[in-house]
Amino acid sequence: MKQIVKEYLIEIKDLLKNKKYLYTIIFISILSLGFAITHYSIGVDDLCLNRYVSDTYILSQKRWGTWLLYNMLNINEFSPFWLDFLTATGLVILAVIVSAFIKKETKEKSVLPYIIFSGVFISSPIINNFFMYQSTNLAIVISNIIIIICGILIYNNYFKCKRKWLYILIGIGMTIPIAMY
């Protein structure tokens, strides 16, 4: 399993070293998410984020994963620019992780398919919808990253390692992102 993780880290590093890929997804991210980051909308839930996190109202909604994340990062008041900026950064990281998985499995040398995939993924309106209406958008992106990593581990365990205990460990790890929604 350590070798598999090393291979994925090499693929991620290879993508990030490619200037065409990196500059293109940064440019697409700015075009797709820049307006949402700098022109945020404020909802009722946003204004009482400190009540949700500090007063543990979010725990009554069974969202202990979000409560845990926001307390670990010490996010207990609404600061839309930084939350949205971290969320956009997480979305780019998610696109890079999935592109590295596709690159490793398809062994495609050209960077164009990964640019297209990452660009469509980052700019997709369905992905970007939670920017406008969710105060827990950072938790959603972090949970998506965890779910994708768990999916990659399940895939590699099924086809390469075949360790049954790893399924149990991944299943336990999946409870955190599920509790963030």
Predicted feature locations:
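Membrane-interface micro-motifs in multi-pass membrane enzymes
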Residues: 59, 63, 87-90, 112-158, ...
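Short hydrophobic/aromatic helix or loop-helix immediately within or flanking a transmembrane segment
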Residues: 56-81, 85, 89
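Hydrophobic transmembrane alpha-helices
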Residues: 95-103, 147-159, 173
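Start-transfer (signal-anchor) and selected internal transmembrane alpha helices
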Residues: 1-31
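Extracytoplasmic catalytic/substrate-binding loops of multi-pass membrane glycan-assembly enzymes
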Residues: 31-51, 57-69
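Juxtamembrane "helix-exit" motif on the non-cytosolic side of transmembrane helices
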Residues: 37-43, 73, 102, 123-133
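Alpha-helical transmembrane segments
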Residues: 19-34, 113-120, 171-172
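Membrane-interface alpha helices of multi-pass inner-membrane proteins
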Residues: 165-181
